[in-house]
């Protein structure tokens, strides 16, 4: 059987990782400034993470959500404490798309409406509702194009107010920082306008923190820079450091009903062990603070590079926009300088390294980049 060929692949076979470095099958070492699409939060093969999930899988890897799993409550308690959302409820699933899918579904259960506001360049996933609120017609199949979504320009407060004033909007879904859209930041004024308009119209505010959350921005959630509290927050990627896991943080105003939401694998014992290990390391090694410190250093230094048109971001979620397409530059970074980076569109390179990136590793990246664009 052949693999279904949907991924354009680099000719690199990564077989080992440690911290912010990975190695291919020829023994070549690379500096990982992408973390597998922002997934690696505490670093590759962290000893505590390896030990925790190894012990768990040797004891019990999985049983269904028909029995008590005390690890789920431990994840909820720990996540609530570190994030500042200890009064919220947690629903555990497997992926970011699934998190957004369930958040939108719950919002519609709540107010009975079907129209959703999303934003230009938004990305929220590839499943039914999640892809419909993603502003990319190329990945929306006809069966997903159901007319539920109105796309608005990011940071256009007047357009937002006008749409919500119609009284038929189920939810507004917005990323804490747009990732696939090129590291675009919503303004504090705009975020507060969303919160106020949602309150006035019984509309649900959903914050997609799948890429921007879990400490990546230098705060636990990127929206905490904007001083708002959404009705739901979706998380994935960094929550499991590579183990498939996701969650929806849900306001107390939502009352759960048996059977309303469900999942086979979500919140399984092994996934919870991975999530607990991640939270252990984040706290012990002050990784949120490290993301803020090292990220600020990178942002400040990159803004001094003459070849870069604009640098955007917060913490270790950084976009570098160039005047010219960056395909060749990204390939040179990988194959000549041995650095993994990401991309957005044709002109933006994204940096999404593990949160344990050191100052020395950041400076090493700057040196390698400078050799290519000096």
What spans do the regions from the language model cover?
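Conserved N-terminal phosphate-binding loop of PLP-dependent enzymes in the Aspartate aminotransferase
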Residues: 1-374
């Amino acid at each position: 059987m052949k693999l279904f060929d949907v991924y354009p692949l680099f000719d690199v076979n990564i077989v080992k990782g440690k911290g912010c470095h990975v190695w291919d099958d020829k023994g070549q070492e690379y500096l990982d400034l992408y973390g597998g699409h922002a997934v690696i939060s505490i670093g590759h093969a962290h000893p505590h993470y390896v030990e925790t999930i190894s012990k768990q899988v040797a004891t019990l890897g999985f049983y269904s959500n028909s029995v008590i799993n005390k690890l789920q409550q431990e994840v909820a308690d720990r996540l609530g404490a570190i994030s500042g959302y200890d009064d919220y409820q947690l629903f555990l699933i497997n992926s970011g798309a699934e998190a957004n899918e369930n958040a939108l579904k719950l919002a519609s259960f709540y107010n009975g409406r079907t129209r959703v506001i999303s934003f230009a360049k938004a990305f929220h996933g590839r499943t039914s509702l999640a892809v419909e609120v993603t502003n990319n017609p190329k990945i929306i199949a006809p069966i997903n194009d159901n007319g539920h979504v109105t796309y608005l320009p990011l940071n256009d407060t007047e357009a937002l107010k006008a749409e919500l004033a119609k009284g038929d909007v189920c939810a507004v879904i917005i990323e804490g920082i747009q990732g696939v859209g090129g590291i675009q930041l919503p303004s504090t004024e705009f975020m507060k306008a969303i919160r106020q308009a949602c309150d006035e119209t019984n509309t649900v505010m959903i914050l997609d923190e799948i890429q921007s959350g879990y400490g990546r921005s230098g705060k636990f959630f990127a929206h905490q820079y904007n001083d708002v509290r959404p009705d739901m927050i979706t998380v994935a990627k960094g929550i499991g450091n590579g183990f498939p896991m996701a969650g929806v943080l849900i306001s107390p105003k939502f009352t759960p009903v048996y059977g309303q939401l469900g999942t086979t694998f979500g919140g399984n014992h092994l996934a919870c062990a991975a999530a607990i290990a991640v939270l252990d390391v984040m706290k012990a090694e002050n990784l949120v603070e490290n993301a803020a410190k090292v990220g600020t250093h990178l942002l400040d230094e990159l803004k001094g590079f003459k070849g870069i048109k604009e640098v955007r971001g917060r913490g270790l979620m950084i976009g570098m926009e160039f005047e010219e397409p960056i395909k060749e530059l990204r390939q040179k970074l990988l194959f000549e300088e041995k650095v993994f980076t990401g991309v957005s569109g044709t002109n933006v390179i994204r940096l999404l390294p593990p949160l344990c990136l050191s100052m020395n590793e950041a400076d090493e990246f700057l040196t390698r980049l400078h050799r290519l664009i000096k």
